[in-house]
Amino acid sequence: MKLLEERIIADGKVIGDDILKVDMFLNHQIDVNLLQEIGKEFKRRFDGCNINKILTIEASGIGIACITAQYFSVPVVFAKKGAHKNVGDNVYFTVVHSFTKGTDSLVAVSKDYIKKGDRILIIDDFLANGAAVSGLIDIIKQAVSYTHLTLPTTE
């Protein structure tokens, strides 16, 4: 997406050899207008996939996921990091490595929110090494959801 590329070039900062800092507009301070355009683009690319849920991981992916969900008119489910008393034991869980923090986190999604047959679009704020997405795919597989990988068009 050209608009995101331009924003990264203008405001992104490279830290070391392998980190792109985008907290000025994406995950510390959020440019909602930019997220709306990103949400529209996700809708355009995945419009024919009959998405009925969007799955992300807390915390930075929630903003993009929520705005995108408005365009699909579907709920957002997010994997919670760590143990939570209000989630209970009826969960799917996996371990996800955070590239930027250098730590592993247990993430969980209640079994009430992912079901077999769901058509789930995974959204995250940024792709470092794919660990968050791989963890979310693992959770979906645990739910025995219908797994259909559709790659977006490049245009």
Where are these regions (language model features)?
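Active-site-facing substrate-recognition patch
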Residues: 1-51
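Gly/Ser/Thr-rich loops at beta-strand to alpha-helix junctions
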Residues: 58-63, 129
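Short Gly/Thr/Asp-enriched flexible loops that form oxyanion-binding sites at enzyme active sites
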Residues: 63-72
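Short, glycine/charge-rich flexible loops or terminal/linker lids adjacent to PRPP-binding catalytic cores
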Residues: 74-120
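Active-site/ligand-binding-proximal alpha/beta "capping" segment
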Residues: 128-142
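Conserved small/polar residues in nucleotide/adenosyl-binding loops
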Residues: 147-153
